[in-house]
Design a protein with these regions (language model features):
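N-terminal secretory signal peptides that target proteins for export/translocation
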Residues: 1-2
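Bacterial N-terminal signal peptides
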Residues: 5-14
Length: 409
């Protein structure tokens, strides 16, 4: 009890700002009625009766089911940041986007440990105060700011986070935030119902976390192996021609998370009802909405290498006049989903299915969510574009166009 009270007083600044989030308990109550929702996609069979619906929703892309489950578990329970802080970031994102489904899946895990209950008690309805410098408020505030805007973390806020967390931990906090931004868009796009078992606290007896002893990040065997594997794959399938991308160089500071994300992405890309150029149109549109310079450059490079005319690429920076009806359907959906994850309707998804088929509609959802992740990771960390990407971008948009577009530090 004393520990809880001390933690509560230490984190009172968390509750100091104007209230603007739904209470956690109200989201949990709403998740009960969401058990009756009808998913917009067929759900895979669940003989054991304990598979999350966000995994079952990949029945049309079955090779991605296990990597999705592994991604969720890895991001939360591996690394050097305590799982409860990462779950708190996920629950805060559920509050920001008003997602009962994401709330119940993070709250049940927080509720299962003493530390989780301490953190849960501090997640009220208010945004994080910028004056608070406790480890908890820095981590949750970082995830909150990055969720609200790709460039939402200020230099001062980032410096405060860096003063408490090392580079690997900052990447871990970032990928955690990115993963939950992916997940909330995925589950809300597909109107996934709450599983009855999700209302019960998780059995935490099999979990364990040990804080690292070293004051700095150590290069692990896993990190070395993961980077070697990724470099080999990059050489074999270098579709953008930029080599080992800076996004990967940064991501592998958290090797377990980077490997889980790559495994999920590789499995997802085995399905191509929607062709690569159209997926690049989707990610270009999402990156433009989010103002992500790094990912916009990559999509321009990809589209140009796929044979898209430079005149069309020029027009796409201004309006949709050069898009085909098929492209426009995907792009308009992606923009709507990017701006407000819980805003799309059954009619919106039905239109996707009519144009792209059932599997193609799911691929549009996944590609949109991919860049909710990647935009926040790359420009959130202010990663520089690779020289080859800048070269091609300026060949299309003119000399100096990249400098005028890049993030001002």
């Amino acid at each position: 009890m004393i520990r809880i009270l001390i933690a509560g007083f230490a984190l009172l600044p968390l509750l100091a700002a104007q209230s603007n989030y739904p209470p956690v308990q109200s989201l949990i109550e709403r998740s009960k009625s969401a058990m009756n929702r009808t998913a917009r996609v067929p759900l895979a069979e669940d003989p054991a009766g304990h598979t999350p619906n966000f995994v079952r929703a990949l029945s049309l892309t079955p090779k991605a089911q296990k990597p999705m489950a592994d991604l969720f578990e890895t991001m939360i329970y591996q690394g050097s940041v305590e799982p409860e802080l990462k779950l708190a970031i996920g629950l805060r994102i559920a509050q920001i986007y008003n997602s009962p489904y994401l709330a119940v899946h993070t709250e049940r895990r927080l509720r299962s440990t003493e530390r989780g209950r301490e953190v849960l008690a501090l997640l009220g309805t208010t945004p994080i105060s910028s004056s608070s410098k406790t480890p908890e408020s820095l981590a949750i505030g970082y995830g909150e700011a990055l969720t609200k805007a790709v460039l939402g973390v200020t230099n001062d806020q980032f410096a405060a986070v860096k003063a408490r967390y090392n580079d690997s931990q900052v990447v871990e906090l970032t990928t955690t935030t990115c993963m939950f931004n992916y997940l909330v868009r995925f589950v809300e796009a597909l109107a996934l119902p709450t599983e009855p078992w999700a209302l019960q606290a998780e059995d935490a007896s099999r979990r364990g976390f040990h804080a690292p002893e070293a004051r700095i990040s150590l290069i692990s065997d896993a990190q070395i192996t993961a980077v070697e594997t990724a470099q080999k794959q990059s050489r074999e399938n270098n579709t953008l021609g930029v080599g080992f991308a800076n996004s990967m160089r940064a991501m592998f500071l958290n090797p377990a998370g980077a490997t889980a994300w790559r495994n999920y992405g590789n499995a997802s890309r085995e399905y191509a009802s929607v062709d690569r150029p159209l997926k690049l149109h989707i990610s270009f549109a999402v990156s433009m909405v989010n103002g992500c310079r790094y990912c916009t450059v990559h999509q321009v490079v990809g589209l140009r290498r796929a044979g898209v005319d430079p005149n069309k690429l020029m027009a796409m920076k201004k309006d949709d006049s050069q898009l085909s009806p098929r492209e426009l359907t995907a792009v308009e959906y992606a923009r709507k989903r990017t701006r407000a994850p819980n805003s799309t309707t059954d009619a919106d998804y039905q239109k996707l299915k009519e144009v792209f088929g059932e599997q193609g509609a799911l691929e549009v959802v996944m590609q949109t969510a991919n860049f909710a992740y990647m935009n926040r990771f790359t420009d959130g960390l202010r990663l520089p574009s690779e020289d080859e990407g800048v070269k091609i971008y300026q060949e299309i948009y003119g000399e100096g166009s990249y400098e005028s577009y890049r993030v001002k530090r």
